[in-house]
Structures are given as C-alpha cells and as structure tokens.
C-alpha cells in the first residue's frame, strides 16, 4: 500500500492523502478513492476527473555548467511556492505546465506506472493534481464556487486594506507624484496647438487684496475669493447655463467629491476641485452634489496656474472615472492662462490626455460656451481640428455590478454566504463618493 498526496487544482484547500495498492490499482480506482476522500468538494462522477502526475522537470547540469541531455522528474514539494498558491486556488506557470491535456493519466494505467522512475512518495511531496471537469457546475455544483468565493473575498479584503493601496491627494500633486500617476495609468500628455478666434471681449478677473495695519498690501487667497470668481465665471457663460439647465457650483473645503478608488491599479484618488459645471438640480439641495449629475467640466482656479498642471490632470482622471460622459478640466488664473485638458487617443489607439492653452479670457469663455452645447466630438473655437473627447478605456475599477454578479453566482450554488455578503456590501459603500466625502478630510 502507498499513500499519495493530492491537491484539487483551482479549489482552495490543503493537500489530502489517499491510500491505494500501487501494484494492481488502476488510475480509475485512484479517481474513486479521491472522490471518496473529498465528497463535499467533488460532485461530479469520479470517471470525469482528470488526474496528473505532480512532477516537475529537473534538468541536470555538468560541472562546466552545460545542460546535459538527461532530464529527471521530481515530485512537487509541499512547501514550494507553487503548492502554496494551489492551496489558495491559484495556478502558477509551473502548475499549468503539469496539467497539460497531453499529460493526463489514463484510466487503464496502473499506479505503479505513475510511480515508475520517481523517488519513493513521502508526506513532504505532492503526487497527484486533480482537475475538475469544466461543466461540473451544471451537474450540481463543485467547489469551483468556493474557489470563486475565495478570489472575490481576496479582492475585497485587499480593497479594504489601505496599506496595500497607493493614495494620491489632488491638492498635493507635485511633479514627481504627477509623473508617477501618469505612469500608473499608462498615460501621456499631448499638447495641442490653438489659433486666434473672434470672440466677445471679457475682462480678466480682478484678484482683490487687503491692507493690513502696517499698510502692506496682501492678496487674498483663492479660497477667500471663491464666491467672487464663481460669480465671474457664471456671469460670462450665464446664457448657455440657463439654456441647458446647468450651473456653476463652488466646491467647499471638505467636500471631496473627486474621491474615487481604482482597484485594478490599487490606487485611491482623493480630494476636490474649485468649481464644477453640472446640472442645476444641485441648487435644490447640496446632497445632490456628490452624485455629479450631468457634470460637464471642472475648473481648478489658481492665482498662479503655471505649476499646477498635475493637480488638474489628477482631478480630470478622477472625474472621468466618476462621470458617465466625457468631461473636460480647466486650470486657470482667470487672466492670461487658460489650460484645457481632456481624454483622447493617440495614433496607436492608446489613451492620452490632450492639453491646450488659451491666453484670452474672451476666447476661453467662447470655448467653454461652445463646449457646454456641443457633443463629445465637435469643432470648437480656437482649435485647428474637431475636438474629440473620450473616456478612459482601461484601468477602470472592479465594477460594483461585477461584485454583485459574482456573489449571486456563488450564492446560487452554495446558498447565502453572510461573510461574502458583508464584504461585498462594504465594498459597495466604500466606492460611493458620498462615503468618501463624509469620512475623509483633506490633509
């Protein structure tokens, strides 16, 4: 009699042992023994199991380092990384190489054939890999569902662990972080030239100053003048706003409406912008702001806008993920610097962010007015070619609908799972912008 250690591929769980007669037992009998040992994990008929010899190729080398023609096979070590991943339902490249279809053990082979040329089996080794049939789910369900559950739980736990994520605050985005963020999203910035266009004249915004007691003039901060510059922007595009039922809303400190998770990249974007152009329904109640209804663009206002490009890029990426339609970002000093950013594509069809600079307030407002009434692809003032705004096509987060779909898939076979249901619910709540706004404050 011999004891063989087995692992079911794709199903989380520890190795288990079966005892068989190595001399006369057929592989078909080994299948029966495996099913008998794991009745809760294996619901299909035993003859539908695929068994593989858990042996890795071990090439030998001469003293000179040259590879010799002789190739040995050795059992997988129970303590190896490959087997550790197997215990969690994962497959490595080495395991994929073992479970190739041309290496499946035939039912009429004997166990002695399997052991031929191998070292004597021991408890520190893995000897047989078990693969369940692909259609086993339709036959009453198998532990492929627990495997799906474990994968989903692992994903959800990683999202809940802040230490495993990279967090960016828009307001702290310097050059180093900015380039790192673009690299994370595999994005490049493409400058776009502009031309002079006839436009209604518009005055520059007058940044106010205060006189302190010693007579020194001090310019008030952007924060202190947000109400004034919001009215300035609204005044210059008011007719278009009214016609399209839009408004310009100032985002107060602490309202981190541009907070979003990007689970696929392990990234969190946090913070807000200064102004948003969106549906005027938000004027009915401030609660609607977190939902960003029909948002068209964000406006980041800086007294000196020359060194804040990466903050605007970060805010654009966050708004793109949160919004249903293509959006635009504007970084401006409300005087001679009006930088527009939007998502587009390069010639190789990869995502990029386009950047165009306009130096006249009149021309800038002409572009904004046209933008708010145009489709995603249209001819705008000051641009040579029609401007095509798109959505980021990659790196989207794990969608909430996918989490629910996977949960229902598991529950359909194994019944309600309260641990998984709680994890999915917490993930859904964490992904809500309102949750971020209520539970986080900008550093």
Swiss-Prot record:
InterPro entries noted in UniProt: Crinkler_N (IPR045379)
Location of the protein in the cell: Secreted; Host nucleus
Stretches for region DWL domain: 57-126
Signal sequence interval, chain numbering: 1-17
Domain remark text: The CRN proteins have modular architectures that include a signal peptide, a conserved N-terminus, and highly diverse C-terminal domains. The conserved CRN N-terminus harbors a distinct LXLFLAK motif, which is followed by the conserved DWL domain. A highly conserved HVLVXXP motif marks the end of the CRN N-terminal domains and forms a junction where diverse C-terminal domains are fused. The conserved CRN N-terminus mediates the translocation into the plant host cells.
Protein name: Crinkler effector protein 161
Biological role stated in the UniProt entry: Secreted effector that exhibits strong cell death suppression activity and suppresses cell death induced by a variety of effectors including CRN63, Avh241 and Avr3a. Protects host plants from biotic and abiotic stresses such as salinity and drought by up-regulation of many defense-related genes, including ABC transporters, Cytochrome P450 monooxygenases and receptor-like kinases (RLKs). Also enhances resistance to Phytophtora pathogens.
Segments for region (Effector domain): 134-439
Gene designation: CRN161
Keyword presence, Secreted: yes
Cellular component, GO, one term: host cell nucleus
Motif placement: Nuclear localization signal 2: 384-393
Positions of the UniProt region annotated as LQLFLAK domain: 18-56
Keywords: Host nucleus, Secreted, Signal
Motif window: Nuclear localization signal 1: 161-170
One Pfam family this sequence matches: Crinkler
Highest taxon of the lineage: Eukaryota
Organism: Phytophthora sojae (strain P6497) (Soybean stem and root rot agent)
UniProt family annotation: Belongs to the Crinkler effector family.
Short motif (HVLVXXP motif): ranges: 127-133
């Amino acid at each position: 009699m011999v004891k063989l250690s087995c692992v079911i591929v794709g199903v989380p769980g520890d190795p288990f042992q079966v005892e068989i007669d190595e001399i006369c037992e057929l592989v078909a009998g080994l299948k029966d023994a495996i099913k008998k040992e794991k009745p809760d994990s294996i619901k299909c008929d035993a003859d539908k199991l695929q068994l593989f010899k858990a042996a890795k190729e071990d090439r030998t080398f001469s003293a000179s380092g040259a590879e010799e023609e002789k190739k040995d096979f050795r059992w997988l070590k129970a303590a190896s990384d490959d087997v550790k991943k197997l215990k969690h339902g994962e497959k490595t490249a080495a395991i994929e190489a073992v479970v190739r279809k041309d290496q499946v053990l035939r039912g009429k082979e004997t166990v002695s054939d399997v052991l031929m040329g191998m070292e004597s089996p021991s408890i520190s080794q893995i000897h047989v890999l078990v693969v369940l049939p692909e259609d086993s789910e339709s036959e009453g369900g198998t532990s492929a569902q627990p495997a799906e559950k474990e994968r989903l739980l692992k994903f959800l736990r990683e999202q809940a662990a802040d230490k495993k994520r990279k967090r960016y605050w828009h307001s702290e985005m310097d050059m180093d972080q900015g380039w790192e963020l673009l690299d994370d999203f595999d994005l490049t910035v493409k400058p776009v030239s502009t031309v002079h266009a006839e436009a209604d004249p518009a005055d520059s915004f007058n940044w106010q100053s205060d006189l302190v007691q010693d007579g020194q003039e001090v310019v008030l901060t952007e924060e202190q003048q947000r109400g004034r510059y919001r009215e300035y922007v609204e005044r210059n595009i008011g007719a278009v706003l009214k016609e399209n039922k839009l408004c310009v809303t100032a985002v107060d400190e602490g309202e981190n409406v541009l907070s979003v998770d990007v689970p696929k990249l392990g990234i969190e974007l946090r913070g807000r912008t200064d102004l948003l152009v969106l549906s005027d329904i938000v004027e009915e109640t401030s609660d609607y702001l977190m939902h960003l209804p029909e948002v068209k663009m964000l406006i980041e206002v800086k007294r000196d806008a020359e060194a804040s490009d990466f903050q605007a890029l970060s805010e654009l990426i966050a708004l793109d993920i949160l919004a249903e339609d293509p959006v635009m970002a504007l970084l401006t000093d409300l005087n001679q610097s009006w930088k527009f950013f939007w998502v587009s594509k390069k010639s190789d069809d990869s995502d990029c962010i386009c950047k165009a600079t306009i130096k006249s307030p009149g021309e800038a407002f002409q572009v904004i007015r046209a933008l708010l009434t145009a489709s995603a692809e249209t001819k705008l003032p000051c641009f040579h070619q029609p401007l095509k705004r798109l959505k980021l096509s990659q790196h989207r987060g794990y969608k909430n609908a996918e989490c629910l779909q996977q949960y229902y898939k598991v529950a359909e076979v194994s019944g309600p799972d309260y641990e998984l249901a709680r994890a999915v619910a917490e993930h859904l709540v964490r992904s809500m912008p309102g949750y971020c706004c209520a539970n986080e404050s900008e550093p």
